[in-house]
Regions:
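Surface-exposed, low-hydrophobicity beta-strand/loop segments enriched in small/polar/acidic residues
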Residues: 1-137
Length: 137
């Protein structure tokens, strides 16, 4: 199965650590879950007993982008049989890096980051938050 690959070099968090967060992803049943890079998550405050790790759930179209982050964990693969970035997923319970979206920041994701795996075909087409925090074109 191919997972989303994200490019973040034009995000402010690349050079400005204040625009980065540490998060742990939870599913709709409030259980720790695996999450792909490129997913937009809603930050729900710090986890109990944690000073730096925030609780995150998949964002929806009604969420305020100011309360969200874009998942972009560091692709470290412990399974030597896996060699491609599209084989990487952030495992359940893992603390993951997230980028706070700011005005004029740009990032890109592979087609797997879009709802239904369909990337926009027109230049300048508007996108939003879709199902499970994926990008909806």
């Amino acid at each position: 199965m191919a997972y989303t690959v994200i490019r973040t070099d034009l995000m402010s968090g690349t050079n400005q650590p204040a625009d980065l967060v540490s998060l742990r992803f939870y599913d709709g049943e409030d259980k720790q879950a695996a999450v792909e890079n490129g997913v937009i998550v809603k930050l729900e405050g710090y986890e109990d007993g944690e000073r730096e790790v925030m609780k995150a759930v998949a964002a929806s179209s009604t969420d305020d982008l100011n309360d969200c982050s874009i998942v972009a964990g560091v692709e470290v693969m412990y399974d030597e049989r896996k060699r491609n970035l599209d084989e990487y997923i952030n495992e359940a319970g893992q603390i993951v890096r997230g980028y706070i979206p700011r005005s004029r920041n740009m990032f890109s994701v592979t087609k797997e980051g879009f709802v239904g795996g369909t990337a926009p075909s027109a230049v300048g087409q508007e996108v939003g938050i879709g199902t499970d925090g994926k990008i909806d074109a």
